[in-house]
Amino acid sequence: MDSKTFAIITDVHSNVESLKHSISIINERENIDQIICLGDCFALGPDPINTLKLLKTLPNCIFIRGNHDRYLLEKLWTQERPNLEGMSPDDPLCQAIVANEEWTANELGDAGVDFCSAMRIAYREIIGNTLVEFTHAWYQRDDQPPSMDEALAWRNHVAVAHPEIEQYIFIHGHVHIPRNETKENFIACPSHISVFSCRYSRR
């Protein structure tokens, strides 16, 4: 049996207490093969500094960049009329988010920039005849996951180079709500602020 167990953390948004709890769950498990963080680590939360410190303690964790991590790198707040995720620049909610992005960046300083700069856009593993793809929302855009039609088109493209693959699993964060969609040999399953482990096997 080919198998691998993943612990997945995503969309922490500086909720350091939830992150501590997630790490405690991981530490209680003896069979975790890989920890993956799906991004949006710092903005929109109260404690980016201690969040960064905790994330740095995760052994061999793969960090994937979320849209809010990208905003930090792009210095979204320096744009003349910054907007995000389809919001109007005049929307008070958009303005509040942009202000929080700036505050978060100031709290983290260069250490936060370096950390986010080292993040990946996506990560892929092949376990037996199963391909598992991890990303924040999608490799083509980090602020909206793919529709099922888009995901199947991606699967068909990948299948050309990997004819041996029998099952595709696409794991993303960003949405903060459950999504478990299956079609043919494709499964889309997001996660949110908590942590869970996944096991994929071929007998």
Go through the PLM ranges and name each one:
Residues 1-7, 124-133, 183-186:
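Beta-strand-turn-beta hairpins that frame and shape the catalytic cleft
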Residues 9-10, 35-40, 62-67, 135, ...:
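Active-site neighborhood of phospho(di)ester-bond hydrolases with catalytic His/Asp-centered motifs
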Residues 58-123, 151-160, 165-166:
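Active-site neighborhood of divalent metal-dependent phosphoester bond hydrolases
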